[in-house]
Amino acid sequence: MNKVVVFDLGGTLMEFVGMPPSWVDYYHTGFENVNNKYGLGISEKQIETAAQILTEYNPRVNYRENEIVAEELFEKAVASWNCNIPVDNIIEAFFEGIKLNTVIYDYSFDLIEKYKRDGYSVACLTDIPSGMPDDYFKKCVLPLIEKIDLYVSSQSCGYRKPNPYGLNYIAKHYGVNINDIIFIGDEEKDRLTAERAKCNFCFIKDIV
């Protein structure tokens, strides 16, 4: 029987240093950087409006389980700017302004290798920070992804935790019963995801 362990990423195997669970307080800074980088001459009110629109779609502010692609969110946020900057460039400048610093925890690689030695396939299921493109996030955690057999994110599967879709997708991918999967995470949302999917769960603090 194929054994599968699934890791959450943020707060479990890595973190963006100093960033809280909700990033809404950083949205204004991100949009300010877009304005400054491209010399758009956008007013303070327009920047604040863009930040507020992005805030309204933040799932930690207004609960949602369905994922929305980053490009759609940013197109809505800057609709009033009437600028001709490609949305991908806007997104890149936005996150440059936030100045993210990624740290992979010291134990992460050893833990992944331990499960592999024990015969497990190793997958991950992670919620992408609201508004962040999947490819951008993957670059931030590339050393981890290179060690993981299957990468699944809220952007790639279309649903955010605690929706069980991602875990069910992983079970189907490996052809295993969902009851035989172990999901490892750091917060109550992860535990609830496992409960709704009816698979096993461990808090990361209990195994490291």
Across the structure, where does each feature detected by a protein language model lie?
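Substrate-recognition "cap/lid" segment bordering the active-site pocket of phosphatases
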Residues: 123-182, 188, 192
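Substrate-recognition element of Asp-dependent hydrolases with the DxDx(T/V) motif
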Residues: 88-104, 108-140, 151-154
